[in-house]
Amino acid sequence: MAALSGRPPAEGSRVAVLGATGCVGRCVSAALAREGHEVLAVARRGGPAAAGHVFAGLDVAAVPPAELARLLTRHRVTTVVNVTGGWGTTEEEMRYAHITLVERLVKAVTLMDDRPRLIHVGSIHEYGPVAEPLAIGEDLEPRPATMYARTKLAGSELVLDATRAGRVDGLVLRAVNVCGPRTTRASFLGAVVDRLRAADASDPVTLRVADARRDFIDVRDLAEAVVLTVTSPATGQVVNIGRGEATAMRELVDLLVAASGLPPQAIRVEDGPIASKGGGWTLADIRLAGELLGWKPRITLAEAMRATWQTPAD
């Protein structure tokens, strides 16, 4: 992993990572620790994913804001990073994970005497579907078309509104689709990994792949962006994080199959419908991330697919 170019952490820097045991949170926690930050790992469940960090078992969306504020104060947290995901399928589940949680988090931060910086990781899908070949810039007016995208946008707007009102020091990263180590099984790539592991040359696996092109980022590159954001003076802004490339889903699957080492006859690929939380085309304009954070993606998709295969979700 390349050295980061941001400012060194201040003495006594402690970062609370919410969602610390998920694919993104686990990688973010490790990256922060490597750069000298103390990490308070917050998640509903602990286990090996939280090893090496101070851990607090907590459902942030379920606790009163005052209780969360006391926890953050007790651990002298200087920055909160929200990488909670939520792969719920119902409107109620999405509102709980994407809106209720952020409402309580923002309220908790405002209750603290020494208010920590708040970094919220949102989604590129908040912008809604866009036409090829548009590169999605931060100035694009969001027009989300799915419940997932609408609730994710609502969560991001809570952070941005509170920052504009001077109640928090917040910043939103809008990340593209994530791949790499421990990609969640609930995602398309995670599901493909499970299918490939069950493949048999005598009984080929059929994969239905949409005719779509999407931007994907290795979770380790996303983690570097989060670390740089923690020490950046930027506030009140949205910053896109991606590779800045739209890759055909079939090409991505081909890279994953190659990483698996399976013979070609073990896989049969068929056309499938576009079933996305956003749209069939995503390509992030990532110039602002370079200007504000000194960040750029470093890991190739081939490397990311090897890591996706070699280090599956627990």
Predicted regions and their residues:
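N-terminal Rossmann NAD(P)H-binding glycine-rich loop of SDR-like oxidoreductase domains
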Residues: 14-35
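N-terminal Rossmann-fold cofactor-binding loop
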Residues: 42-47
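NAD(P)H-binding glycine-rich loop region in Rossmannoid oxidoreductase-like domains
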Residues: 60-99
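Active-site beta-alpha turn of Rossmann-fold NAD(P)-dependent dehydrogenases/reductases
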Residues: 84, 119-122, 145, 174-176, ...
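Short-chain dehydrogenase/reductase
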Residues: 95-99, 134, 140, 145-153, ...
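Conserved Rossmann-fold NAD(P)-dependent oxidoreductase catalytic core, especially the SDR/UDP-sugar
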Residues: 103-147
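NAD(P)-dependent short-chain dehydrogenase/reductase
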Residues: 132, 160-214, 219, 254-257
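C-terminal substrate-binding subdomain of Rossmann-fold SDR/epimerase-dehydratase oxidoreductases
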Residues: 199-314
